[in-house]
Amino acid sequence: MANYFNTLNLRQQLAQLGKCRFMSRDEFVDEADYLKGKKVVIIGCGAQGLNQGLNMRDSGLDIAYALRKEAIAEKRPSWRKATENGFRVGTYEELVPEAGLVVNLTPDKQHSAVVQAVQPLMKQGAALGYSHGFNIVEVGEQIRHDITVIMVAPKCPGTEVREEYKRGFGVPTLIAVHPENDPKGEGMTLAKAWAAATGGHRAGVLESSFVAEVKSDLMGEQTILCGMLQAGSLLCFDKMVADGVDPAYAGKLIQFGWETTTEALKQGGITLMMDRLSNSAKLRAYALSEQLKQLMQPLFEKHMDDIITGAFSSGMMADWANGDVKLLGWREETGRSPFENAPQFDGKISEQTYFDHGVLMIAMAKAGVELAFETMTRSGIIAESAYYESLHELPLIANTVARKRLYEMNVVISDTAEYGNYLFANAAVPLLKEAFMGNLQVGDLGKPVADGEIDNARLRDVNEAIRQHPIEIVGAELRGYMKDMKRIAVAN
């Protein structure tokens, strides 16, 4: 199989990278009706598989779970989760032939084996669904021409998908139809119904493409969403301890600081996050972020280039074939890091202290979000897609760090995201150690910035630069559709 994106000519590549349309709410007046009366069979009962299934069932759809025979016989966690929630469970052979829609929600590295197992069992004219297009775009999986191939990609972890639905809302969602597999022209109608069944239509849906979703998703998770959190956590902890800060305090400030400070992004973008700082701290955070952007731009561009060409995917798939030797080695190395093994801090840290003592962390978040967005849009990805794959998801991933530090983040994200995260962090950490961390000042991390004289013109210009960044402009519009989403819990 050949990388699908690389089989396209330049015009086709640009067209698919740039496909992005915010859909109006009146396009979903029929909600999930088109799928009612059809049997929907989900393969995979992880966080996305279970929670999407629960939402779809509550929306009136007929949902069952197809699992491997061994998973059923051995009563593995996937079988237990499905049966404990009252779903019908069966083997591929029992359930797939009757399905109008088969939804593949297994991990990326299992997709080829799963799709090759279920394709011969799917009835003529059925549909195959994904929530991430890696198998189609990067692996180049060939699907039978009578099968419609669609994607519904919620831009949140599975638990959020469920919780927002239970509140009568939903999470922002990308939908797409594979242009090589829409024989009856019903792909978009099917995708809209599936998105509505998960509640996504209440929070905003982007009509995208498999290509745009995959390339932007890979870029976001490798750089700002996971890689920057990993690199920033390791660097900031080591810096504070070297400066004499109690390791327990440093560990807590970082573990919960990402979550607390980036919560402001969800409510009001980079503007609000920076507005939580004093004027002196804001000016310092802005200056640090500009230095970071200049240093890291080539690294962000390298990741984007490797994603576009397929070099990243081919390297990762080679590691799959080699038993995940690199991935598992990097995971073990992270587990041995001083930050992961820092003692617990029993004292309380106020919400504002996370901002006041975390100026460098805020600068890192700002620089990473803006660089990821800028790099994606310069590569042909539309601003709305770039926003969802950078700023929007950052507080959600930061929330996983708050649970059990980097271990939890790397458990929750996909193996694909974890592999890319390590690639980025392994390059970013030595780069910033050598060229940046040694130039920090007192007040950048672990202590507040001292108040000083403020130049009104300078403050005016910085405020204007923050507010007029393109991600702030598109973000203000998109957040308008998400204003009812619940606030992520902030530690104290």
From Swiss-Prot:
GO cellular component terms, A-Z: cytosol
Pathway: Amino-acid biosynthesis; L-isoleucine biosynthesis; L-isoleucine from 2-oxobutanoate: step 2/4; Amino-acid biosynthesis; L-valine biosynthesis; L-valine from pyruvate: step 2/4
Keyword Transmembrane helix: no
Catalytic activity: (2R)-2,3-dihydroxy-3-methylbutanoate + NADP(+) = (2S)-2-acetolactate + NADPH + H(+); (2R,3R)-2,3-dihydroxy-3-methylpentanoate + NADP(+) = (S)-2-ethyl-2-hydroxy-3-oxobutanoate + NADPH + H(+)
Binding sites annotated in the UniProt record for Mg(2+) 2: D217, E389, E393
Protein name: Ketol-acid reductoisomerase (NADP(+))
Source species of the chain: Sodalis glossinidius (strain morsitans)
Active site (record annotation): H132
Co-factor requirement: Mg(2+)
Cofactor binding comment, as recorded: Binds 2 magnesium ions per subunit.
Residue intervals of the KARI N-terminal Rossmann domain: 15-208
Stretches that traverse the bilayer: none
GO biological process: one example: isoleucine biosynthetic process
Function according to Swiss-Prot or TrEMBL: Involved in the biosynthesis of branched-chain amino acids (BCAA). Catalyzes an alkyl-migration followed by a ketol-acid reduction of (S)-2-acetolactate (S2AL) to yield (R)-2,3-dihydroxy-isovalerate. In the isomerase reaction, S2AL is rearranged via a Mg-dependent methyl migration to produce 3-hydroxy-3-methyl-2-ketobutyrate (HMKB). In the reductase reaction, this 2-ketoacid undergoes a metal-dependent reduction by NADPH to yield (R)-2,3-dihydroxy-isovalerate.
Residues binding substrate, per UniProt: S414
Keyword rRNA-binding: no
Ranges for domain KARI C-terminal knotted: 209-344, 345-485
Residues the entry annotates as binding NADP(+): C45, G46, A47, Q48, R68, R76, S78, D108, K109, Q110, G158
Membership in a protein family: Belongs to the ketol-acid reductoisomerase family.
